[in-house]
Amino acid sequence: MFYTENYDVIVIGGGHAGTEAALAPARMGLKTLLLTHNVDTLGQMSCNPAIGGIGKGHLVKEIDAMGGLMATAADRAGIQFRTLNASKGPAVRATRAQADRVLYRQAVRQALENQPNLDIFQQEATDILLERERAAGVSTKMGLTFRAKAVILTAGTFLAGKIHIGLTNYEGGRAGDPASVTLSHRLRDLGLRVDRLKTGTPPRLDARTINFDILAKQYGDAELPVFSFMGSTDQHPRQIPCFITHTNEQTHDVIRNNLDRSPMYTGVIEGIGPRYCPSIEDKIMRFADRTSHQIYLEPEGLTSNEVYPNGISTSLPFDVQMKIVNSMKGLENTRIVKPGYAIEYDYFDPRDLKPTLETKAIGGLFFAGQINGTTGYEEAAAQGLLAGINAGLFVREKDAWFPRRDQAYVGVLVDDLCTLGTKEPYRVFTSRAEYRLLLREDNADSRLTPIAHELGLIDEARWARFNRKMDNITKERERLKQIWIHPQSEHLNHINGLLNAPLTREASGEDLLRRPEVSYEKLTKTAAFSPALEDKQAAEQVEIAIKYQGYIEHQQEEIEKQKRHENTLIPERFDYSLVAGLSNEVRAKLEQHRPVSIGQAGRISGVTPAAISILLVNLKKQGMLKRGE
């Protein structure tokens, strides 16, 4: 049965990847359909009620800089905001928000329902239609067929999902939701490489049964940060604290004594779990010398009694979960509202994707989110945005776009996945980026908003505000260059009050701000350099750009050297068997990975600099040496 309307883009799945994937092409003016098994769970935070963190906050800022939704939703739902690594350098500072699940979901749904060019339909997708090795639409469980020129799959943990609690298991996409079994079988028939991964979640606790009076409180920052470049603290709801407790020897004994009932330690679960968010069972076994682990009790919302105990993800049986919880300080009489569980699910080898997240085998079919082997809301949303952009460009038959590693954390994420693949759930860290001083949270807009404007992703109000900010930064830097303080200046005493050593020769405002003891805020409070910029975001960029100018210029020089190879493209169907001098091992790896550029080829493990030289010579001989943008 064919539906009466055709679409440009269809998105399967309404999680964090799916919502961004649907909004992007709709903003670009393309007729888009979002298919979800349940409209009421659009934007659902299935695991921890938080957005951001180290590396992850950077992704949220980048999504926002390109017109995405996540930052705005987090600002409207955040009930505790903190800047992590605030005392460290600007490259690793990161925003994190504890979020009210209901408010977050409401913000997402409101944005989706009010987005022009976007339709939402509640129905389970069971098949992807193909014509001449290209995606042509989707069919659903009730027999409806929707036609489209591009399809984006963002199925999360739903593909052949299996939930484990103790030695009991059953099909499910997450607690309370069915798995997508039919679609999983169909996708396996397409010849794509499929494997299994595992993730988990802790039990949810009843706040009314927790003794908060004897627990340490963790408050948010006094000066509240915001996620969105268009946001303000006025959007934040009421702020509340989290609480901290700890596991102890009794907790650890309970876990060790019940490992024979753990699906992970009895071989029932075969999928590999996230390295950086291990289950409490894994923590106890891997860090056997530790007598205690810190557990954060995170409220799930302003109107909810549920509490998320961050740090005790588990798939042990329910009776064991109760003993674990009741063994901890403040939780002696606590009730569990929802049991913790582990979930195994299908994921696809991301090396079978182009950096645009289009599958190499099937034109117009894009994958985004956990099905590409990642973990985390932010990683999923970033992929959804990129897939949505490129699905739109594909439909319009325009050149694809994806960010470089030196351009965005999204670029680092996608390059790591598509070049190296992953055998465990992948998450972003600042340490994964070679040029992290250039990929800061504060400058995500200057890196990406002009591109978003060119792609049609942002409105004129945002574009005008961005340009005002950039203009203010330029003018302020020039102003600080022009103001000089000399040893006879009437302002000398005020300036010397900021310095570790008195000024002995003339210095400009820029010179003074380069000194580690001088901040922009302090400098612009002096009569010589007031007034300060009213825009705190612009002021922050001015200070960082001046203080770290030497380091930034050094990284930019390194990037220019790398670009020579990064922008040297390899033809899509290049025949490596014709390249004399390559070892069989290198040839096999290049055939397997199909890198899109010389730079990407050089990051494949085992592909030597000598092999790259041979490849460059061969491309030149065949007249295929082509530079990208």
Swiss-Prot record:
Q: Name one Pfam family in it.
A: SAM_GIDA_C
- Gene Ontology MF terms in the entry: flavin adenine dinucleotide binding
Q: Can you tell which superkingdom this protein's organism belongs to?
A: Bacteria
The parts of the chain that form a coiled coil are none
Q: What is its main location?
A: cytoplasm
Which GO annotations describe the biological process of this protein?
tRNA methylation; tRNA wobble uridine modification
What is the protein's given name?
tRNA uridine 5-carboxymethylaminomethyl modification enzyme MnmG
Q: Which SUPFAM superfamilies match?
A: FAD/NAD(P)-binding domain
Q: Which PROSITE patterns match?
A: GIDA_1, GIDA_2
Q: Which family does it belong to?
A: Belongs to the MnmG family.
| Subunit structure, interactors included | Homodimer. Heterotetramer of two MnmE and two MnmG subunits.
Which cellular component, as a GO term, is one annotated location? cytosol
Which parts of the sequence bind NAD(+)?
273-287
Q: Where in the cell is it found?
A: Cytoplasm
UniProt xrefs under InterPro entries: FAD/NAD-bd_sf (IPR036188), GIDA_C_N (IPR049312), MnmG (IPR004416), MnmG-rel (IPR002218), MnmG-rel_CS (IPR020595), MnmG_C (IPR026904), MnmG_C_subdom (IPR047001), MnmG_C_subdom_sf (IPR044920)
What is the protein's known function?
Answer: NAD-binding protein involved in the addition of a carboxymethylaminomethyl (cmnm) group at the wobble position (U34) of certain tRNAs, forming tRNA-cmnm(5)s(2)U34.
